[in-house]
């Protein structure tokens, strides 16, 4: 172990604040060993460092190209390329088709360009036949690549035309996705048009692809660079993902205004990321940064819901012009009385700007919608992963991760997710304790005996510690675009925006809360909707804790739905995976207890009494009672190897929002002190200058905002 790694481990353990907690035997049992660093939360600390120093981005000034393939009347985008200002060579590439989503377009495999192109060049000779096939299809006009550049840049267009970069990026994307198809690990919500393109292209490229995988197994390690920017040792690196959301004029102008969904999501993502780096919870992606992309229009996006946004923008602009001309196309008298300034303000919430926000975060694995198919079909997963759907302790570990994530979200952040469907929950296969040999499916090596993770969930420490089997990763919660902000945020909001804003914010949110309740519990609102909304507005402090049950109910209901999928109960799948009835019963039990908590406490609130506890305070000890440290026999505890600990009692001392608030193990001065003579560039090849520029004051962003303001004022809308 290097001096730097040893120091990071010691600092991480120190920050867990485990000293003088519980009995001597408990403290001894809970001790983390340096030899297990590779499997501990230190690797998430390392992931934070790699994301921050390996993927720095200024908050504006990028040109982005979206690459499309057109083949046999089907088109799909498959990658993005990013240039920083007017640099000739790209800075980043993202080799991935988009995922189907409502609020933005997500892709993973966002990587630094330099290791990407170095890796491709290293294997290009072995790909000659595949490149030739693609070029012949282009020459025959059966296949075409189409490029859209935002904002348009002639230099970048010429650069792509004079190189074979588009071809290289397509083949890199193709190799990664065909590898996932071979492994049966392709996500079910990947763009369907892209999957059709691959299916239609397969007869043309099948022989060349199979020959490459068979004859060049020694080169497969280079493909890691296409996924996470690493090399042969890069499998320990995190993958980075991008989410791009088109912004309305108001969203583009009012940066960090959490009354707007996109900024509310950014805020919550940053706060949840801080839960990870402070050793409180592993259940969220690490937030990297956000940047504005300019010149974006509907051509950039593929998802239907985003196309609808641009259609509404067109309609709103046309209606606005008619109103201002005085044409009587609307019957609302009050609306007609609005001033031009008022109309423009209202329009700014509907009209699309030409700006999109790109958010980069740690990629946290397969969604639970995809997980059953992956586990039941893939021959390369270790039994530890497969057991998530077969072994009770493994399944309960995944279930607890998700419930604990909801618990800390409610208690630490005063936020309810409110949209925990199967594509907003993931299994993150990270720092595994078992390793498979790609050449010998089904053969694996276990590096640690009986690995477990401990979760300290309250101030009583020892009696509130849960112990779970390590499942070569953990469950994660993503996408906070429909989250509910609790009453504790009111003081901060009032300080920033004033009391009138706070009242408007919570009044608007009450409509969203009713919509969520209407979706999950329609019977609850029967003849009581006005009464419930009145309580939300007048006594939200009492009401919030009662509706934390929503997230536990959604977790249980959707996991039960996942386990009940018809194909999991076919004879073919049952040969590989046998779903236990116990799992279904556990989910149903959690579901029922969540409903019981909600209805009981709703009655309490309507009676004018406070609800002191959140759903997690009540449900965790009931559902996971057997996994509490005091309830586990001592001989069983002694057989466990504790490889990680998370401590709810930690405060959020550190934050990823600014350099000054980074943890010690992410501070450049501290890192170099323990680097044994290595330079910053030796550790982080991007270099310190690139990182500092990304965090410097960005005057270019101010120019974008000024341009949007002028556009809004001058369009006479």
Swiss-Prot record:
Keywords assigned: Late protein, Virion
Protein localization: Virion
Main localization, broad class: virion
Induction: Expressed in the late phase of the viral replicative cycle.
UniProt cross-references to InterPro entries, sorted A to Z: Kinase-like_dom_sf
SUPFAM superfamilies named in the record: Protein kinase-like (PK-like) (SSF56112)
GO cellular component: virion component
Family assignment from sequence similarity: Belongs to the asfivirus C717R family.
Protein name: Uncharacterized protein C717R
Organism of derivation: African swine fever virus (isolate Tick/Malawi/Lil 20-1/1983) (ASFV)
